[in-house]
Amino acid sequence: MAVALAACNNGNPQDQKAIEPESTTIQATNGNLPKKDIITNEGLGEFKIGDTIPDSHPDYDIKPVVSVDEEEMEEVTVEFSKDGVVQFIIYPSYIDETDAQSNEIGGIMVVSDQFTHNGIGVGSNVNDILKANPNLEVTFYDDQLFRINDGGITYLISSEAYDGPLPEVPFDIPAPVENPTFKPDAKVSSIWIHPTF
């Protein structure tokens, strides 16, 4: 998983920042359960950016996951599952002075199709989103991922969903894409909830 650092606006933006995942391989679904329109630019329902990461929850199984990045630095993310299916992943914020992870929510990766923002969720058709919201910015990053930015909410789309040659962009610098063309069945693969600055 490629990650980049982004500032965390949780009341003291000088002290903390959140890692920003650029892709995820987890795809979760719970079938035909009713959707919950609880994604906002502040968090996912009761889970808010800047709040303490809970150790337990009555509705979810919680599992910390340790990974090592390209620079051999350990990072811990926290998976929230229901009935054995990962629903979302919490990324702790970082403390600038020590570069250590805090126990506060820095960002949330939604991988379940059960949560939406204004009706848009994992599995939503990308072309329908852009048609209904023509002013949303589309960016391309690192030959892997397109992002549709909507304030503190970013819809992530695999580059395989793009129709035509991929845009040329500087390495590791998100670049705006003018008049993007996605395949008819292009879908949102995950949703990243993050601080805005």
Task: Give residue ranges: language-model regions.
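Charged C-terminal helix
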Residues: 165-173
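C-terminal motif of bacterial Sec signal peptides marking the signal peptidase cleavage site
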Residues: 4-7
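Short helix/turn-capping signatures at newly exposed starts of structured segments
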Residues: 9-142, 151, 174-197
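Short aromatic loop motif centered on NTY/YTY
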Residues: 139-166
